[in-house]
Amino acid sequence: GSRIYGTVPIGIIIGEEAIITVSTQEVKLLNDFIKMRVKGFHTAKKTRIILQIMYKNATYYLFYLKQIDRLSESIQKELHKSMKNEELLQLLSLEKSLVYFTTSLKANEDEKEKMMRLDVIKQYSDDKDLLEDVIIENKQAIDMSQTYGNILNGTMGVVGSIISNNLNIVMKVLTSLTIILAIPTIVASFMGMNVPVPLADNPLGFWTIILITIVITAAFTRFMLKKKL
């Protein structure tokens, strides 16, 4: 089925003696800190905690962006075999996910810049490298999200063109078949008129008319095939 990768907003409240994080649901990112899975994590260093949250957040974005890219490649391979609605809906879901990712990452970039300008956030020389890593990781995530989004958008456009082209081909074939099948009907209707018609008294007239009908139908079919109609 279709799968959408979403984002969850996290609020960070900076107090005199504590940092409080708020989210609408349980977040794996924060659990990494709670379970002490983050290297160099110290609750006494507020600035570092904020930077570490931002860095960890960017790495998670990169991780899921790579997942989206792999899933997109897999779906596109399936589309080469047979174009089903399920695969198209999956691509649409991934495209929506990338829109959410790009929007959230850009918002994070803006918030990071605002946060670093606040007087309440003390900046230490030891955290300079970590801040640079945060900037690099977040920028890389934004670039990846936009690139994958553009590729997926282009893919959806190509798929739409292929579907439209296939529909036109089917309509052409059906129209051609309708015209070809109409030829015997027209001949039969003409010969069935209550007026004198050629070959009416000929004992081989019926078979002659059948042969003429077949020849006309075959000639018209060949003409349409030659013109690729």
Residue locations for each model-derived region?
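Peripheral, non-transmembrane regulatory/ligand-interaction domains of membrane transport proteins
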Residues: 1-118, 123-124, 133, 137-140, ...
